[in-house]
Structures are given as structure tokens and as C-alpha cells.
Regions:
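Residue at a conserved register position within TPR or TPR-like alpha-solenoid repeats
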Residues: 27, 61-64, 98, 115, ...
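Canonical positions in the second alpha-helix
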Residues: 9, 42-43, 79-80, 114, ...
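Canonical tetratricopeptide repeat
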Residues: 22, 56-57, 93-94, 110, ...
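Short coil turns that delineate tetratricopeptide repeat
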Residues: 14, 48, 84-85, 102, ...
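Alpha-helical linker/edge segments of TPR/alpha-solenoid repeat scaffolds
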Residues: 33-38, 65-70, 100-107, 137-141, ...
Length: 172
């Protein structure tokens, strides 16, 4: 029913980005992945570098769950990384896309960044420290992770000094 309503509204208001995004989501969730992907690819051509289009399409691709979908989402989001790096939703979508694409190092980095941006600096620090032990981490990635650890550590130490603890961490 949502698809029919949105399709009717889109016919009445052609070019409305928000209706087109909603229709694409409804198509995907109704099992019409190919039709939804085609709609989103068209929206990307019409609105290159649009955060709403990229984030919505990435979410749909991530829900599809295939390696190819993850690679497509990762490739689509990567150009926006420099301008959207401080957005936890963006980082979560990029992390999931990287995970599906088989890029565990980038996925771990993005999940850690999402944790930090969501107010969980200690979780982010722990994730980054675990990532440093990953043998797949190359020299450049290690330098990136070390720099991020160095920038997050003072925040974590200050929170500990103030007695602020992350309630989600199991402290044994």
C-alpha cells in the first residue's frame, strides 16, 4: 500500500526527491530490490554527492546483505567520507558496507568512529586497540589507527578522572 501511495504522489509531484527516496525504500522492502536499485541509481545520477540519496541507498544495499551490495555501498559512500566523517549514521552505514564488502579493517575503523561520535569514546578506544592486533592492518592503516587512538585517549582519561563510566562496558 505504501508503494502505491508514494507512486501516486510521485506522479503528482515529479522530481520530489523525498518521495522518490521513500518509494525506493518501499520497493526494496516489498522485495523489489532490482526496481529499487534502479530507482536509486537514477537518483544518484540526478543528485550526485547527495547525502540523503547516498545514505538511504546505502541502507537499502546493506539490508540486501550481499558482498556486491556492500561493495557498491562502500564505493558510493567513500567520496562523501571527508565531508560526512563526523556523522555517526554515516559511519555506521559505511562500517556495515565495508563489513559486507569484506573490508574488515575499514569496517572496524568506521564502527569505532561511530561509537566515538555516539558518545562512547571508551568503546571506540577499545575497538581501535583490538584493531591494532589485526594482522590485516597495513602500515598506513596502523598509522591512521594510532593517530585516532592518540586523539581519543585524552577524552577517555578525562572521563575516567571524572568518574564517568560507559554503562555498556563490562568491567570485570
Amino acid at each position: 500500500q505504501a508503494r502505491q501511495t508514494l507512486a501516486g504522489l510521485l506522479q503528482s509531484h515529479p522530481g520530489n526527491l523525498w518521495l522518490a527516496l521513500g518509494l525506493g525504500e518501499a520497493e526494496s522492502r516489498a522485495g523489489q530490490a532490482a526496481q529499487a536499485n534502479s530507482r536509486f541509481e537514477q537518483l544518484l545520477r540526478e543528485h550526485p554527492n547527495s547525502r540523503p540519496v547516498a545514505l538511504t541507498y546505502a541502507e537499502i544495499l546493506n539490508e540486501q546483505g550481499s558482498r556486491e551490495a556492500g561493495q557498491r555501498a562502500q564505493a558510493m559512500l567513500r567520496p562523501l567520507l571527508s565531508q560526512s566523517g563526523n556523522d555517526p549514521v554515516f559511519q555506521q552505514r559505511f562500517a556495515r558496507a565495508s563489513e559486507l564488502a569484506g573490508d574488515s579493517v575499514r569496517a572496524s575503523e568506521a564502527y569505532a568512529e561511530a561509537a566515538f561520535l555516539s558518545g562512547r569514546p571508551e568503546q571506540a578506544l577499545m575497538q581501535l586497540q583490538a584493531l591494532k592486533r589485526n594482522p590485516a592492518l597495513d602500515y598506513i592503516g596502523r598509522a591512521r589507527v594510532d593517530a585516532r587512538i592518540e586523539s581519543i585517549t585524552p577524552t577517555v582519561l578525562e572521563l575516567r578522572r571524572q568518574g564517568v563510566q560507559d554503562p555498556d562496558l563490562d568491567r570485570r
